[in-house]
């Protein structure tokens, strides 16, 4: 019975001492991995930031192109009624009261200059 107790005590002491060593080793490994993880996270963050900046630049470029062309897209074409106070006729057209068919409609139309 004493041998069983001594053996059990010896195994218990070895398990505790080796377990503590493993715990310290695990703690050191975890610190190393978190330091490596931080560098990976910084790298990934920088990469993501670059991609987002490129995407933002493309979107702003598309918006500026759209705004340059938007005047011509939103202008009023020839023969379309317009407001004499706020003419939005396309380039080369003027908002005038026509001589013939304007009499019936009492309106201004975009006509060539």
Swiss-Prot record:
Compartments, record wording: Secreted
Region (Disordered): 61-83
Origin superkingdom: Eukaryota
Propeptide segment residues: 22-74
A cellular component annotation (GO) from this entry: extracellular region
One GO molecular-function entry: toxin activity
Ribosomal protein found in the keyword field: no
Keyword terms, alphabetized: Disulfide bond, Ion channel impairing toxin, Knottin, Secreted, Signal, Toxin
Tissue: Expressed by the venom gland.
Annotated signal peptide: 1-21
Disulfide bonds: 75-90, 82-95, 89-110
UniProt key word Signal: yes
Free-text domain note: The presence of a 'disulfide through disulfide knot' structurally defines this protein as a knottin.
Function: Probable ion channel inhibitor.
Family (UniProt): Belongs to the neurotoxin 14 (magi-1) family. 01 (HNTX-16) subfamily.
Name the UniProt record assigns to this protein: U11-theraphotoxin-Hhn1s
Originating organism: Cyriopagopus hainanus (Chinese bird spider)
């Amino acid at each position: 019975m004493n041998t069983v107790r001594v053996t059990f005590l010896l195994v218990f002491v070895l398990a505790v001492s080796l377990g503590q060593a493993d715990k310290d080793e695990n703690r050191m490994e975890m610190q190393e991995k978190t330091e490596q993880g931080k560098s990976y996270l910084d790298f990934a963050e920088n990469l993501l930031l670059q991609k987002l900046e490129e995407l933002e630049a493309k979107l702003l470029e598309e918006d500026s192109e759209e705004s340059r062309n938007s005047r011509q897209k939103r202008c009023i074409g020839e023969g379309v009624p317009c407001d004499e106070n706020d003419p939005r006729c396309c380039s080369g057209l003027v908002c005038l009261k026509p001589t013939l068919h304007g009499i019936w409609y009492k309106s201004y139309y975009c006509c060539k200059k």
